[in-house]
Amino acid sequence: MCIRDRDNVLWKPPGGKTLGFHQDAAYDDWLIPQTMMTCWMSLDDTSKETGTLEYIKGSHKWGLQPPKGEFHSPEDYKKELNIFAEKNNKQIQVTYVEVPAGGVSFHHGFTWHGSGINTSSNNRRAIVSHCVPSNAKFHPTNQGGTAKTYKKYKKENSDLLDEEYFPLLWESNSI
């Protein structure tokens, strides 16, 4: 079973800046279990030139690292990735997510990913859905990071995710 945690609409216009390498699940320390799956749906044809999504092959097996703070438009968008890889003796192999408009890519919440500058004359837009297991619930004590935003949806006296805000997308007996 799967619950939608949140959605994002992304727009990288021509000349649009970088997105620093990060792991999505690192920013969900307000959840137990702290894991997720991300669905990245492209609204435009993507390429390396449009600043498409970049994955690091096998990085979902490297374990979850603490969040590194702001990752929008850093000067060196691979800095945190390079620091982690060097410190932990990991090999970096970049995969560019090049899909046509309407194409979809899924990644594990532990996958290191980011994107470069859009050097093309085209927009790069996407809709992103982050999904968590149906047994996910609010962490009883974590209050920092994105918890400040999402704890406002917590019902009093319950750690369960309220379906009014976190809808059930799929369950095994729904087909």
Describe each PLM feature range.
Residues 46-112:
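Double-stranded beta-helix
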Residues 68-70, 104-106, 110-175:
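Non-heme Fe(II)/2-oxoglutarate
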Residues 14-27:
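Short acidic (Asp/Glu) patches
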Residues 8, 23-25, 41-45, 57:
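Short, structured patches in soluble enzyme cores that scaffold and shape functional sites
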Residues 29-48, 98-99, 106, 130-134:
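Short, conserved beta-strand element in jelly-roll/cupin
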